[in-house]
């Protein structure tokens, strides 16, 4: 199981950021994020907003549930 949290840097983080960016165009309460592969405050804030919008536990951490929802939203 992948878990993404602040201060992680890798290609998989860029994937999460791409999903978040796509969601931010559909839902105005989710802020736009840069796609740099770094899980910083900007990404954490967007993850938290995404979790809040979809009534997930608001941790700012991309756990399995959050990742699954991000992925499904990217297919919409």
Segments and roles (model prediction):
Residues 1-37, 42:
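Acidic, Ser/Thr/Pro/Gly-enriched interdomain connector segments
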Residues 35, 50, 54:
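Calcium-binding motifs, dominated by EF-hand helix-loop-helix domains
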Residues 19-23, 53, 73:
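Active-site catalytic microenvironments for nucleophilic, acid-base chemistry
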Residues 55-76:
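Extracellular LysM carbohydrate-binding repeats and other cell-envelope/extracellular binding modules
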Residues 47:
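Conserved hydrophobic/aromatic packing and binding residues within compact polymer-binding modules
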Residues 41-44, 64:
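Short, electropositive, low-hydrophobicity segments enriched in small/polar residues
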């Amino acid at each position: 199981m992948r878990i993404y949290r602040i201060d992680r840097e890798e290609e998989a983080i860029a994937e999460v950021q791409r999903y978040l960016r796509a969601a931010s165009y559909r839902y105005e309460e989710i802020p736009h994020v840069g796609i740099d592969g770094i899980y910083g405050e900007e990404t954490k804030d967007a993850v938290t907003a995404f979790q809040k919008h979809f009534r997930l536990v608001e941790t700012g951490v991309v756990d399995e549930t959050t990742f699954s929802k991000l992925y499904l939203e990217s297919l919409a």
